Amino acid sequence: MQVISYFDSDRKPHWLEEIRRSDWRAGAFLSNLISKGSFVNSFGEKSKILLLTEGDELISFCTYTEKDNIQPTELTPWMGFVYTFPEHRGHRYIGKLFNEIERIAENDGFHAVYLSTNHVGLYEKYGCEFLTQMNDMDGKSSRIYIKRIY
């Protein structure tokens, strides 16, 4: 398995189609942002889309962004759009992407990464800790987690 950056890939059309295959509304939203060329404008210049691949197959994806749907906030950077295809769940593959996000964040001078979700018990097994509740841009309450980088 290999972690690649969508924007650094020479196979963007293929990986965009793979993201579109996800059965998740946020995956469709992400692919739409990519198609429109508005991902970076929405989430910040240093934002990345990370893909865990096995040959031509997309196993998992997630993002590393300066901003998230929790605004306004001083918290940065964020990991989001966390998804693993159903046939690959249960193997903790997303941890490989989280490790890459931690490496990038540390290289960018950060000591923590944040995550907005309503899942309970999923991200804790990757070392994320509940931080607080905040409202997203639609006014809906979201759990904010912090992943400290040591």
Model-derived regions, located:
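Conserved acetyl-CoA-binding loop-helix of GNAT-fold acetyltransferases
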Residues: 81-84, 90-103, 115
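Residue-level detector of beta-strand face positions
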Residues: 49-51, 114
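Conserved beta-strand in the GNAT
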Residues: 51, 57-67, 78, 83
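Short loop/turn motifs at secondary-structure junctions and domain boundaries
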Residues: 40-45
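Short hydrophobic/aromatic beta-strand or adjacent loop that forms the aromatic wall/cage
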Residues: 47, 140-145
